[in-house]
């Protein structure tokens, strides 16, 4: 925009401001009630037909009603829409001389006309004369507030549009030439398609999820050499949905596809579609696919698609809100009346359970790829990728780190090595050692390290509590192995006991669940066995919540109780408006609920008694372990097992099935 156009735009703003100022000045002039009302009063005084000039004396309305009852009123003339009346009264009691009096008629005097007719009074009505000046002033007065609101809103939109357009040429209306152009821009996607995307990520940077990587390598091959697949009648998948917990590499996979395919690529978040203005989301979806059609083959990546793809009609009454309109448009664009050839939509979410069924069907998202946390071999491969630019000590084994980080995803493993590097730099070490790795693992799992426990009594209580957990984990065959026991406070915990969980958490036996319940109750059992029931602390509150949840799942989900092999809970649990709607919390009778409560109590009591028995039978081992723990504040699982092995038989396990009643 040249200098002349810029000056013209500024003149437009000045004229708008001047118009608003004139309206405000006029409003202030009318509010003063000086010039106008003086002029109006002078006009009325000079007008012989005005009510003020018809009668000089006033009379109260109550007195008027009294005169009507006595028959003294002969004629009455109404002025100003019946608000003022001029009456002519005559009577012998009034000196037989007619009097003309002015009366102000109150609002709501509906019975006056009837009384006048009964008294045979001559009634005359005079229509109000049009006061042009007053009409204009009333009209302007009624337009002042709406005009100011419109003007302020107009200027607000211009300022917002100028900020969004990042205008550098000095024009107040931006390069679009005005607010109308910018308002139309609300339905446009601001991000441009990357013709040759350079994300810096390729499939060489992806590790630990080889099966998933193979799926996407096939899509990349299809985009590069479609004839290889079309020769046998195959068509490219229209959509791929990545599902998995946070931090497992879903977004990283999309970056790798963009870096490998070398085709136009555009990425957008699901939350960018929905705005406060109705219809903007659907317009942005249309604009997105219009851009993609201009550069086919093309890849569209929608991150966190659950922000716009939630189940329609959720909640009470459903509703056709902005999110549903956006979803409907997305469904149409992906597989509607018009076909989109050469456009591959890749989406990622960690809440696939709340997505709309129409979005998940073949033809839209042909493939649903689950990205789970990596296994041990996958973690080793991921650690090798992230350790490329880290100076690790030769004594460090990635296999050992992978063994200690069961359940970690790619993002957590990357953060782990980064935390270890930060700790090494803080201690001014040239390389990352085993100590830094251990501290980083503890920091990622439990949080920042807190000050040591100074009070000897509390330290001893915490030591017995944590040793109780570790004792059960060491002695029970079905329990996870002890990894570490520490008295160093981290986060809100005064002490911690780590276990090495099973590599496949999806397959857990009944004995493993029961052993975990006994292990969780081991801390409280140690407190009772050593200090007595009066010295039981509140430190086991989190353990009790975990125990109750495990016992409840044994009964409701897995059929591992005396109630029998039944499942009393549906997948997804009880939800309220979270993408699906309403579901009652309990889907069984009250009588069965009582039995469930009894079973929960039975399981927890039997497991707690077992934990107390373990502490009583292995008191010497427990005391020795606590002595070493208080002295060193940290014991590894191997060190703890050596202490226990001198005075306890490893492992000890009982048949729990016989303890649970069938009825």
Swiss-Prot record:
Disulfide bond positions: none
Main localization category: plastid
Enzyme type, top EC level: hydrolase
One of the record's GO cellular component terms: chloroplast thylakoid membrane
Record's subcellular location: Plastid, Chloroplast thylakoid membrane
Lumenal side: 34-135
Binding site for Zn(2+): 465, 469, 543
Ligand binding (ATP): 244-251
Stromal topology ranges: 1-12, 157-663
Residue spans crossing the bilayer: 13-33, 136-156
Single annotated GO MF: ATP-dependent peptidase activity
Membrane topology summary: Multi-pass membrane protein
EC numbers on record: 3.4.24.-
Cofactor: Zn(2+)
Residue ranges the record marks as coiled coil: none
Repeat among keywords: no
GO BP annotations, alphabetical order: protein catabolic process; proteolysis
HAMAP family: FtsH
Functional description taken from the UniProt entry: Acts as a processive, ATP-dependent zinc metallopeptidase.
Name of this chain's protein: ATP-dependent zinc metalloprotease FtsH
Organism: Heterosigma akashiwo (strain NIES-293 / 8280G21-1)
